[in-house]
Swiss-Prot record:
Subcellular location: Cell inner membrane
GO biological process: regulation of pH
Regulation of its activity: Activity is regulated by pH. Active at alkaline pH. Amiloride strongly reduces affinity for Na(+), but does not change the Vmax.
pH dependence: Optimum pH is 8.5. Activity is null at pH 7.0 and increases as the pH increases from 7.0 to 8.5.
Organism: Vibrio parahaemolyticus serotype O3:K6 (strain RIMD 2210633)
Primary localization class, coarse: membrane
Protein name: Na(+)/H(+) antiporter NhaA
Superkingdom field: Bacteria
Amino acid sequence: MNDVIRDFFKMESAGGILLVIAAAIAMTIANSPLGETYQSLLHTYVFGMSVSHWINDGLMAVFFLLIGLEVKRELLEGALKSKETAIFPAIAAVGGMLAPALIYVAFNANDPEAISGWAIPAATDIAFALGIMALLGKRVPVSLKVFLLALAIIDDLGVVVIIALFYTGDLSSMALLVGFVMTGVLFMLNAKEVTKLTPYMIVGAILWFAVLKSGVHATLAGVVIGFAIPLKGKQGEHSPLKHMEHALHPYVAFGILPLFAFANAGISLEGVSMSGLTSMLPLGIALGLLIGKPLGIFSFSWAAVKLGVAKLPEGINFKHIFAVSVLCGIGFTMSIFISSLAFGNVSPEFDTYARLGILMGSTTAAVLGYALLHFSLPKKAQD
């Protein structure tokens, strides 16, 4: 039994599978006699914040820290290091964010409250998408994995910018000042070639608290900390950035993201009507993910190649690109996160229907994306 559990957690797809299980359990509990207990637990206050708040603002900051680390590594020595390798996934990512947002706006342009959710279908759940791709094992070319990873990382970076610019509340000048000072201290530590992680974590904790109180979403502190961690260690030392990235990954994949899914996917269907489910808000999200993502990613990718701006990565074709573009319609955790920012404190009903739209679009995209990859990839494993 222990060997079975150990082998499961070694699977590339394990994180995505756990996300699905956590979301399914949450939905089941929320619509059972335990539903009130579930909601009561999430709204229990611990050290001045609810459990839900700690998960969404606290633990998710660690997830965004991991994103910051991954983006920095890819920019300095990975798939985004050179213009030639970065331009193709970057163009694809722009299309993949623009088209879903436009579809959502087309559906909800006449609703001044619903329009604030325009960024919900622009996100891609990197863990879920990579997990689905991993189910196909070595049939997937390495270049296609790199393309999806680079695209999703750029997408995540875009989401970070969107949150900072469009989902920020009333600002506290004093808290912002402390945040800017702490940011300066972090990058001063980097400039002084401090490679011990403890000083970064202490200053980072103060930064997180300052950002939490500033009106800017606290998870953005995680990205700043990630960018400040040095890539190179002193002579004879391991890379601090890679060490932290390696250490955080299992906690994020197998702990934080499933916990986030459990806390946010538990939607009570009581009072949910078919007319509400087919209204402009959930339809705009579901179709934004299901149609907007592949439309934007594929059309921008195709245009970039045909115009000579970028080249297709070696070993993959446009059938593969289209399959991946459908897979990127899995918004799930990132889309739910943006929904909580857009509607969480404004309209619980909007938030409920938004999450149902996310689940409909993401689930369909996962099934279709897997099927398209299955039929478009070589039948035999790649070397």
